[in-house]
Amino acid sequence: MTTPTLISISDVLIARVIALGDALRARGWRLATAESCTGGLLAGTCTAPVGASDWFAAGFVTYANDAKTGLLGVPDALIAKHGAVSSEVADAMARGALAHANVQLALSITGVAGPGGGSVAKPVGTVWLGLAWVHARETQEGLPAGGDAPRMGSRTERLQLDGDRAAIRAQTVAIALERLIAQAQGQASA
């Protein structure tokens, strides 16, 4: 019989998650994630500390393109035009997670973790992060008059990471946590 391997999350990442949770609680915000190449590692890291249910709402693992479309509402045409690993798809994933989970902050991850699957334009280690949020005015004062949907902001960021598959995925989670903390603390550019 084989002994199961235990997955351990570093103390550094746990400290980042606790800082993220504190910042989200202070704003009364909840978080959702939408992950492709990390396969739920960010959501798993976020839910490691006790009390994460106060601020973590949902994690969508949308590894396949049809999952991105079916669960997050990413248009097939967008994926066909730009590819799953693109700024446009990362943005649509983050916006879809924000809307479908009814949260104030969402982060998406799509990329090429390797060892195969890369191209000249999108080599192994290419990762796009998408960040979407509801503007603070709407979260403090409720929905705009007339029942309109709250205004959202979003941005994307391309990462080019080195290492094997595990290293690329781990680096992505660490960077994603940094970006989430900055946004939740109001330090990120909107």
What are the language-model segments listed below?
Residues 1-190:
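Short alpha-helical segments enriched in small residues
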